Amino acid sequence: MTNSAVATPSQTNPFDARGPFLLSLFMTLVGYSVLVALPAINGAWVDQLGFSEVEVNRVASSDLLGLFIGAVLTSFLIRSWSRQNLTYLGIALSIVANGLCTQYVDYETTLILRFVAGLGAGFYTAVAVASLGAHSKPREAFNWMLLAFAISQFLELQLIPHLSMNGIYLFFIATYVVTLPFVRLIPTTNPPTAAQDTPTESRRPTLLAWVGIGAIVVAYINIGAYWSNIELAAEAAGLDGNWAAQVIAWCVLLSFGGCFTAMWVLKKFDYDRPLLFTFVLMVLAVGLLAFNFTAAVFVFSVAMFNFLWIFIDVYQMGGVSVADRSGSAAAFIPGAQGLGQTVGPFAASLMLERGWGFDGVFVLCALASATALLIYTLIYFTCRHRPVV
């Protein structure tokens, strides 16, 4: 038998404990709260603050750019700084920025404040995701996270349309405040390398963790552009805005199906081929809207998008964490998502500004998914003869 890294009682993984695990789950929901509710928040910025379609895409990009930078900084600092201190820093920035958003409503100031709020969310969320990635079974941990994510997304999309703009900002503040007493539960040490119950030589090369990070960036260009514009595109196509918002909210429940399907597939099949097939379906789901935006196609696209998004996330996030147990790559995941979500809405705003319309936006979405498909296809053919964790 080869030298296996088998956990011993003296090497108990503190990130497997119930308290830190549940706190990390909740923190990811808080940190991603802007991301999951973008359709409703963008609608509020348009309806309540009078921002244009171009401006809301840029405000969303600013928020998610902050998320990216905060997560990148955390990925470098997490080995030398206390995870608890990084979390407190994220909470402070987010509370201050969201509080100031209630006082300043002009476009330029909102653009800056959303960046600062996103920066705080980046520190906060990166710690949470890295803590889940440090779990001894990271794919299962991320599956539970995404299951909770689906519930949170549905509830937010039901709640936020009924809030004033200030109410939305105060809601975000409250979610950070309630975690303050529990930050002390975050482990201050790194996970033991022995927490992974697979032989060292069977682990995927760390380089693949960073290739996976790049693939997440590309995949989230699709998610950012699609999720920021789908409700606005439905209204532009002549569909009733309230009906479209309800379709989006209820289709989020299909994320549950994505989670449970991912759990079942993990037990029955390998990692790569289901992911490749899922990306093929994603290209079709988002690309159809560029050619035929009817009510039926809209419902089909939103339903498929929500099912496939979560399914893809389970594999992407779990794969990165399995490939790199140090936590640096896992801490970078929110940054990768934030970067993709920054590029997506910003590129969409440029397309709309130049008169390419929402058709061009959905072509962008399809191309981004196709590029991610190509990356994972190359990984598959490169690594298919290697043992997979």
Regions found by a protein language model. Give the residues of each.
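Paired small-residue
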Residues: 97, 108-117, 296-304
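Extracytoplasmic gate region of multi-pass secondary transporters
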Residues: 39, 207-249
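A late C-terminal transmembrane helix in Major Facilitator Superfamily
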Residues: 323-357, 365
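Helix-loop-helix hairpin linking two adjacent transmembrane segments in secondary transporters
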Residues: 135, 141-188
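Helix-to-loop junctions at the C-terminal end of transmembrane segments
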Residues: 70-83, 258-271, 352-353
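C-terminal transmembrane helical hairpin of 12-TM major facilitator-type secondary transporters
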Residues: 269-316
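Conserved MFS/SLC helix-loop-helix module at the cytosolic interface between two early adjacent transmembrane helices
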Residues: 69-105
